[in-house]
Design a protein with these regions (language model features):
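Cytosolic nucleotide-binding catalytic cores of signal-transduction proteins
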Residues: 23, 42-45, 69, 73, ...
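Flexible glycine-/small-residue-rich
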Residues: 47-49, 98, 105, 125, ...
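Catalytic core regions of nucleotide second-messenger enzymes
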Residues: 31-32, 36-39, 70-95, 157-158, ...
């Protein structure tokens, strides 16, 4: 974007940024993300606060959001090149990490910002810098949570500046195409493995039902899971 902006008038750049950030913000809101701040043409987004759908669903929402952002930019290419005189196609890169961070009001005694801080944020920022144009790059922490929903390229190791250790990361290829039979199999496997499902198991089960249910019964099942998370599941004979 920096190289492109040098070839375009400042007023047109301002108009483009307003257009672009509006488009990306709408997608963020659609998938339940919290916009922390705009940094030039970049957006910092986090999940898990002020509301969370659980680790698995939050991570999945974030990757779904990233994919839709990429798809939206691709669809807007003809309009962008015509409306804003861009000499080349615009591509965005996205870095995603999962980890603990501090969220709250930080700043001086005269001015506070609601923001997230911590090493997990820094790693996500570095992954964005390491990503290729048009790539969604996720850390291993994120991949572990969402690998049932997406396909990834082979593992690669990066050494992000400012991070004291190498980071294993993966490029998101696309969303897995799961048929109804495989979804039922995954849900059944969760149920029969242990009647005392963990929170992560419940998150995974809810995510599967919510996304892939093809009739109203799926919605009812999902609602039932939300209302009775601690109820044991019996295996009828």
């Amino acid at each position: 974007f920096t190289s492109i902006s040098e070839q375009i008038e400042a007023e047109e750049i301002s108009e483009f940024l307003s257009f672009y950030l509006t488009e990306m913000s709408a997608i963020t809101e659609k998938f339940g993300g919290t916009i922390d701040k705009f940094i030039g043409d970049a957006i910092m987004i986090f999940y898990g606060d002020p509301q969370s759908d659980g680790d698995v669903q939050d991570a999945k929402n974030c990757v779904d959001m990233a994919i839709e952002m990429q798809n939206r930019i691709d669809a807007l290419q003809p309009y962008i090149r015509k409306q804003f005189s861009f000499p080349t196609n615009l591509k965005i890169r996205i870095g995603i990490n999962t980890g603990f961070c501090n969220v709250g009001n930080f700043g001086s005694t005269s001015r506070l910002d609601y923001t997230a801080i911590g090493r997990a944020i820094n790693v996500a920022s570095r992954l964005e810098s390491e990503a290729e144009s048009g790539e969604v790059l996720v850390s291993e922490n994120t991949k572990i949570l969402v690998e049932d929903f997406f396909d990834f390229s082979s593992e690669r190791v990066v050494h992000p500046k400012g991070v004291p250790h190498p980071v294993n990361c993966y490029s998101v290829s696309h969303e897995k195409s799961l048929n109804r039979e495989s979804i039922i199999g995954e849900c059944f496997k969760l149920v029969i493995n242990d009647s005392n499902l963990t929170d992560n198991d419940l998150d995974t089960l809810k995510a599967l039902v919510a996304k892939y249910a093809e009739d109203p019964n799926g919605v009812i099942q999902n609602e039932s899971i939300k209302q009775t998370p601690s109820s044991p599941v019996s295996n009828p004979h």
